[in-house]
Amino acid sequence: MPTINQLIRNTRQPIRNVTKSPALRGCPQRRGTCTRVYTITPKKPNSALRKVARVRLTSGFEITAYIPGIGHNLQEHSVVLVRGGRVKDLPGVRYHIVRGTLDAVGVKDRQQGRSKYGVKKPK
């Protein structure tokens, strides 16, 4: 506990909160161009081939973004919309690609949770 004189000499510093998605620069989403589309393996104890893309954002950042859902049409030079949100078992992946916007099509034959994968209501 500081004394009154210590508090007069230098005041208490406010706690600065660090953003979990710095590349978005305070925006809800950002547009970017895929520079590489590839798969990586998750950390223990999980096992899979997770689809990710290296994306150069309009803010100038080069980030790794996860491609959610089963199957995708993304390739190099695809223009995508990126939102925040990490993937727990992929270290360094702190962003998600938004399906159903720009060049990323929605997930085919998706019935439930459609809004998260950019799928229109089936007729």
From Swiss-Prot:
Localization annotation: Plastid, Chloroplast
Source superkingdom: Eukaryota
GO biological process: one example: translation
Any one Gene Ontology molecular-function term assigned to this protein's record: structural constituent of ribosome
Keyword Secreted: no
Cited Pfam families: Ribosom_S12_S23
rRNA-binding in keyword set: yes
Record InterPro entries: NA-bd_OB-fold, Ribosomal_uS12, Ribosomal_uS12_bac
Principal subcellular localization: plastid
Record PROSITE patterns: RIBOSOMAL_S12
GO cellular component: chloroplast; small ribosomal subunit
Keyword field: Chloroplast, Plastid, Ribonucleoprotein, Ribosomal protein, RNA-binding, rRNA-binding
Subunit structure: Part of the 30S ribosomal subunit.
Functional note: With S4 and S5 plays an important role in translational accuracy. Located at the interface of the 30S and 50S subunits.
Recorded family membership: Belongs to the universal ribosomal protein uS12 family.
Protein name in UniProt: Small ribosomal subunit protein uS12cz/uS12cy
Source organism of the structure: Atropa belladonna
